[in-house]
């Protein structure tokens, strides 16, 4: 079914890895680190430049503001920078590994042109794919899939994922025709936006994903083995 496409654009959460990974692993890891980051912040600390962009001097208020952004899942670019910094430490220390589905790992390895589009920052995307839990190895082993991925897009590079113009921007940047691209996501609003510029779409139906009311109008993929 995917043989007609030369280029693949992939969402992350709910598509190539469990949707629970962000809310049950990444977000708690970050929120647990926030008090320490804020209270120990000094002018020469690594996160000082990021925290200063919130323009909140009171540390208690700053901490509350950051945690509120996380709780409401606000796509704030400053928050994304801070999360990227914290998650980098987690990945590099071995405390975090991304549970990418085995069929998605195989898919990324065997397809010639694969791009990633996520609301998470490009930096966070590269970290995730750089520290993937190897399904065929002991728990401490990880895979680096970045060499198999041709490019990364986020809300800063391309725009919001629910806006058609964002996909037009991506087509321009990768130099592809809409008819050559298949976009896979668990979010129907994103699929509709991509379809608005003529990109073919597929609905990722993974364990734990929310039911899609009009799911029958999309080509549904429970895994990527058929692609």
Swiss-Prot record:
Its Gene Ontology cellular component terms are: cytoplasm; nucleus
Task: Identify the EC number(s).
Answer: 3.1.3.77
What GO terms are given for molecular function?
acireductone synthase activity; magnesium ion binding
Which residues are noted in the entry as substrate-binding?
Answer: 118-119, 161
Kindly state what the record says about how the cofactor is bound: Binds 1 Mg(2+) ion per subunit.
Q: Which InterPro entries match?
A: Enolase-ppase_E1, ENOPH1_eukaryotes, HAD-like_sf, HAD_sf
Q: Where does this one sit in the cell?
A: Cytoplasm; Nucleus
Pathway listed: Amino-acid biosynthesis; L-methionine biosynthesis via salvage pathway; L-methionine from S-methyl-5-thio-alpha-D-ribose 1-phosphate: step 3/6; Amino-acid biosynthesis; L-methionine biosynthesis via salvage pathway; L-methionine from S-methyl-5-thio-alpha-D-ribose 1-phosphate: step 4/6
Catalytic reaction annotation: 5-methylsulfanyl-2,3-dioxopentyl phosphate + H2O = 1,2-dihydroxy-5-(methylsulfanyl)pent-1-en-3-one + phosphate
Which Pfam families has this protein been placed in? Hydrolase
Entry's Gene Ontology BP terms: L-methionine salvage from methylthioadenosine
What enzyme category does the UniProt record give?
hydrolase
Cofactor list: Mg(2+)
- State the UniProt keywords alphabetically: Amino-acid biosynthesis, Cytoplasm, Hydrolase, Magnesium, Metal-binding, Methionine biosynthesis, Nucleus
The UniProt annotation places Mg(2+) binding at: 11, 13, 186
Quaternary context: Monomer.
State what this protein does.
Bifunctional enzyme that catalyzes the enolization of 2,3-diketo-5-methylthiopentyl-1-phosphate (DK-MTP-1-P) into the intermediate 2-hydroxy-3-keto-5-methylthiopentenyl-1-phosphate (HK-MTPenyl-1-P), which is then dephosphorylated to form the acireductone 1,2-dihydroxy-3-keto-5-methylthiopentene (DHK-MTPene).
Family classification: Belongs to the HAD-like hydrolase superfamily. MasA/MtnC family.
Record protein name field: Enolase-phosphatase E1
**Source organism:** Saccharomyces cerevisiae (strain YJM789) (Baker's yeast)
- What lineage does UniProt assign to this protein's organism? Eukaryota, Fungi, Dikarya, Ascomycota, Saccharomycotina
> What gene codes for this chain?
UTR4
């Amino acid at each position: 079914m995917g043989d007609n496409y030369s280029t693949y654009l992939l969402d992350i959460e709910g598509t190539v890895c469990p949707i629970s990974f962000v809310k049950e692993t990444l977000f708690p890891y970050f929120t647990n680190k926030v008090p320490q980051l804020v209270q120990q912040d000094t002018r020469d600390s690594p996160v000082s430049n990021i925290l200063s962009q919130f323009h909140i001097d009171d540390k208690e208020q700053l901490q509350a503001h950051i945690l509120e952004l996380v709780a409401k899942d606000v796509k704030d670019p400053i928050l994304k920078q801070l999360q990227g910094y914290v998650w980098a430490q987690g990945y590099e220390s071995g405390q975090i590994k991304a549970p990418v589905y085995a069929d998605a790992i195989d898919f990324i390895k065997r397809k010639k042109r694969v791009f990633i589009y996520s609301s998470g920052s490009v930096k966070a995307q590269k970290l995730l794919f750089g520290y993937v839990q190897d399904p065929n190895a002991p728990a401490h082993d990880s895979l680096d899939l970045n060499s198999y991925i041709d490019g990364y897009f986020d809300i800063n590079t391309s725009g919001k994922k629910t806006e058609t113009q964002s996909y037009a921007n991506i087509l321009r940047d990768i130099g592809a025709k809409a008819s050559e691209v298949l976009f896979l996501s668990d979010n129907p609003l994103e699929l509709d936006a991509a379809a608005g510029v003529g990109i073919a779409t597929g609905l990722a139906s993974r364990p734990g994903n929310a039911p899609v009311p009009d799911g029958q109008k999309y080509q549904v993929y429970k895994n990527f083995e058929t692609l």
